[in-house]
Amino acid sequence: EAAIRDSDWVYLEGYLVTSPTGHTAALKTKALAEKYNVRTAVSFSDPGMVKFFRDNMAAMVEGGVELVFCNEAEAMEWGQCDHLDEAIDAIKAVARRFVITLGAQGAVSWDGENLHRVAAKPVEAVNTNGAGDMFAGAFLYALSRGESDLRATEFATLAAGEVVKYFGPRLDRDACLSLRRQFFGD
């Protein structure tokens, strides 16, 4: 409980909805975050999580969360629609802010007032494993530095574009530091 109380954010993976114990832990974590005014971010994780565990996912975002991360397919599944604008409206109903990744097209983010579209830099993608996790981690890192949602989306798009150029779900430390220097100048 102290770890949650002393945090700025809790990040809940949508995959937790598949297991009764994982789902219970996610709901308890969210409740503790609310108790201590800690912001909650939820990742939808996979279109299948939204489709086949919809009730559990809905329970995880019930009452609203600060931030949702999802890709376009997950957003469409959440909105039960075929158009991004409809999906955006559905996510606005459960999240004060959100980011929808669009693969090679970049991302769309909502900061509570403005919708931002960020284009991705063209890259030669060899493996998309880890792109969503890299995006979420980079976005939250940028926010922890005091950056705006737009700047966080720009940095996260750059970072996700970097990880897909390699096999494996993550970048090594030097590559992460290089990205930070490239984007933030430090």
Language-model features: where?
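Short amphipathic alpha-helix with an adjacent loop that forms part of the alpha/beta core around
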Residues: 1-5
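Short SAM/SAH-binding signature in class I
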Residues: 8-9, 136
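Conserved beta-alpha-beta core of the PfkB/ribokinase-like small-molecule kinase fold
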Residues: 9-89, 105-106
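Conserved phosphate-binding/catalytic region of the ribokinase-like
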Residues: 31-35, 55, 59, 80-186
